[in-house]
Curated annotation (Swiss-Prot):
GO molecular function: ATP binding; ATP hydrolysis activity; ATP-dependent DNA damage sensor activity; damaged DNA binding; single-stranded DNA binding
UniProt cross-references to InterPro entries, sorted A to Z: AAA+_ATPase, DNA_recomb/repair_RecA, DNA_recomb/repair_RecA_CS, P-loop_NTPase, RecA-like_C, RecA-like_N, RecA_ATP-bd, RecA_C_sf
Protein name: Protein RecA
Compartment(s) where it occurs, according to its Swiss-Prot or TrEMBL record: Cytoplasm
Alphabetic keyword roster: ATP-binding, Cytoplasm, DNA damage, DNA recombination, DNA repair, DNA-binding, Nucleotide-binding, SOS response
Organism: Xanthomonas oryzae pv. oryzae (strain KACC10331 / KXO85)
Upper taxonomic lineage: Bacteria, Pseudomonadati, Pseudomonadota, Gammaproteobacteria, Lysobacterales
Gene that encodes it: recA
Listed SMART domains: AAA
Family matches, as CDD domains: RecA
């Protein structure tokens, strides 16, 4: 660059800093790129699939799937992990359906959890924005986008047609929220539901669509698709769901990874079940017929007994988890990958 251009650029940068503050514009080479801060999800498999060890702070995350697939369970376990690390968590319950007894079973300290049950979508998003701007909350969960009902719809008649109202509300809120989320380093998780598109579909195109328009798809750094794929039985009794979680979008690591984990009723994601499955995959746990062995010790006949053994011997589970993390998890979080999408 010639001297005249350099002087003009220096003058422009100086003017920008005077008007908007130091750091408004910077050279990428001058900025130290730090590893992304994360909040673990409570699922070792998912933490590894995300590539960064958890859900990234200072970002928007969307978790969507069919009913009873484990969306709220996953977010409550992330809240429990955040609280264990000394963080503050908020849950905006637009569905008015949070069960504090179940949350406590998943490890959430319900006495310290900030809970809001707003009347309208505008109120819910305004509360979320105020909590984010306080810079004192580590994770804010909004359950769910479908329940963020615009004020005009609540005040109107039952049959009123108000097309695009919720999509406009989400688009406006996310434009306002994203800058504050980055500055305050808060993780904001939106839980979303699925609907079916009505009309003729192109071959190979999915008829499923998430609620609340397209804005959230663009603003989210991570999108997780969670689905129940089978039942876990103990004899004839169903004790949980086999669940597939797919990383549909990831701006911080390679996307499209998927994991199959177990969600047990009243317990949440089975940590011991994940350790056994990953141990077998990594050849740290040996499976001979129905028997599972770790090291020189047999830990159980059948997965259920092996799971019980690890639960009763936490020191063995901790040792196995440490070995698995060393084998599967990258030494450091990767730098942020480029993103081709443009925000609308």
């Amino acid at each position: 660059m010639d001297e005249n251009k350099k002087r003009a650029l220096a003058a422009a940068l100086s003017q920008i800093e005077k008007q908007f503050g130091k750091g408004s514009v910077m050279r990428m080479g001058d900025r130290v790129i730090e590893a992304v801060e994360v909040i673990p999800t409570g699922s070792l498999m998912l933490d590894i699939a995300l590539g960064t060890g958890g859900l990234p702070k200072g970002r928007v995350v969307e978790i969507y799937g069919p009913e009873s697939s484990g969306k709220t369970t996953l977010t409550l376990q992330a809240i429990a992990q955040c609280q264990k690390l000394g963080g503050t968590a908020a849950f905006i319950d637009a569905e008015h359906a949070l069960d504090p007894v179940y949350a406590a079973k998943l490890g959430v300290n319900v006495d310290d959890l900030l809970l809001s049950q707003p009347d309208t979508g505008e109120q819910a998003l305004e509360i979320a924005d105020m909590l984010v701007r306080s810079s004192s909350v580590d994770i804010v969960v909004i359950d769910s986008v479908a329940a963020l009902t615009p004020k005009a719809e609540i005040e109107g008649e039952m049959g009123d047609q108000l097309p695009g109202l919720q999509a406009r509300l989400m688009s406006q809120a996310l434009r306002k929220l994203t800058g504050n989320i980055k500055r305050s380093n808060t993780l904001v998780v939106f839980i979303n539901q699925l609907r079916m598109k009505i009309g003729v579909m192109m071959p190979g195109q999915s008829p499923e669509v998430t609620t609340g328009g397209n804005a959230l798809k663009f603003y989210a750094s991570v999108r997780l698709d969670i689905r129940r794929i089978g039942a876990i039985k103990k004899g004839d009794e169903i004790i949980g769901n086999q669940t597939k979680i797919k990383v549909v979008k990831n701006k911080l690591a390679p996307p499209f990874k998927q994991v199959v984990t177990e969600i047990l009723y009243g317990e949440g994601i089975s940590r011991e079940g994940e350790l056994i499955d990953m141990g077998v995959e990594a050849k740290l746990v040996e499976k001979a017929g129905a028997w599972y062995s770790y090291g020189d010790e047999r830990i159980g006949q059948g997965k259920d007994n092996a799971r019980t053994y690890l639960r009763d011997n936490p020191q063995v589970a901790v040792r196995l988890e440490a070995e698995l993390r060393e084998k599967f998890q990258p030494a450091e979080a990767p730098r942020e990958a480029g993103d081709d999408e443009e925000k609308e």
